[in-house]
Every structure is written in C-alpha cells, then in structure tokens.
C-alpha cells in the first residue's frame, strides 16, 4: 500500500481518537478498510458505556462484521492509533483480519510486541500481518492527556 493511503486512513483513525478524547475516553480510534474504502470506524467507549470491552478495535470489528454480514474479515485491514491490547489482538486474530497498521506503541498493555506479541504466535490458526510506525508522532500526541 502507498504511504499516502496509509496516512489517509490513519488520519481517519485519529479523527475517531479525537471523538473519544472529547468524551473523556482513552483517545484511541480505529478504521477498517476493504478494497480501499472505509467500511467501519470506531473509538473507545469504555467509560461512556461502562463496559471494559468497548475498545475501538472491538467496536470497529462489530460494525464491519455487521456491514459485511460475516464475522470473517479476511480481505480487510485495520488502522489503529494505539497498539492493541491482548483482548483486541485476540479479536483481530479471530476475525481473520488480513493486516493491521499501528500508530503509537503501548508499553503498558501492547500485545503486538511492546509487552507481548500475540501476532507472532504461530499456534493460532490465523496470522495477522502487522505494520508499525504509521504517523507515530501524531498518534502519540493524541494520547498526551492520559
């Protein structure tokens, strides 16, 4: 994928992170792309919904699955402003998503290499491609209030 496209989609994820910030949530945003088009977007709603599972990645997976009428997101990619936690990494693996693009790393709960790496565990029946370093500075800046 061309860098400009990657930045375009990460900017869309950052717009979602801003929505989370405005709701006093941890400012994380995610978008799911299929065939070069955004099919789902979401931001953290854990505080708003009083539900620890309402992470941006989970919500985006749910929206994309509903839109595609399938839990298998094999031809989809996700752009995430913050490295996913183990819960979200598990959901990404189970959704069969093709690839994820990560902005900022998470040294507290990151499950794509910062704390542990579920995506490199070859015992799972699906392998998610991971690309890190997309608009890192902007994604880190979106987290400053934490």
Describe the role of every protein-language-model region.
Residues 4, 27, 47-55, 83, ...:
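Residues at secondary-structure transition points
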Residues 28-33:
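Short beta-strand scaffold segments in enzyme catalytic cores
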Residues 1-23, 71, 84-144:
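Zinc-dependent deaminase
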Residues 54, 58-93:
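Helix-adjacent hinge/juxtasegments
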Residues 46, 80, 104:
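Residues that line or immediately flank small-molecule/substrate-binding pockets and catalytic motifs
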Residues 43, 55, 126, 145:
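Histidine-centered active-site/metal-ligand motif
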Residues 39-46:
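Short beta->alpha transition motifs characteristic of CBS
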């Amino acid at each position: 994928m061309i860098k400009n496209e990657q930045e375009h989609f990460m900017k869309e994820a950052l717009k979602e992170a801003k929505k989370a910030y405005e709701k006093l949530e941890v400012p994380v945003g995610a978008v799911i792309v299929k065939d070069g088009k955004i099919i789902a977007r979401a931001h953290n709603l854990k505080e708003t919904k009083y539900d620890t599972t309402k992470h941006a990645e989970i919500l985006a997976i749910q929206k994309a699955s509903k839109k595609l009428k399938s839990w298998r997101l094999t031809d989809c990619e996700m752009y995430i402003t913050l490295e996913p936690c183990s819960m979200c990494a598990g959901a990404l693996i189970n959704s069969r998503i093709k690839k994820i693009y990560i902005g900022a790393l998470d040294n507290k709960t990151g499950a794509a290499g910062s704390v542990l790496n579920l995506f490199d565990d070859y015992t799972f029946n699906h392998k998610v491609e991971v690309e890190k370093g997309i608009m890192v500075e902007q994604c880190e800046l979106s987290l400053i209030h934490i």
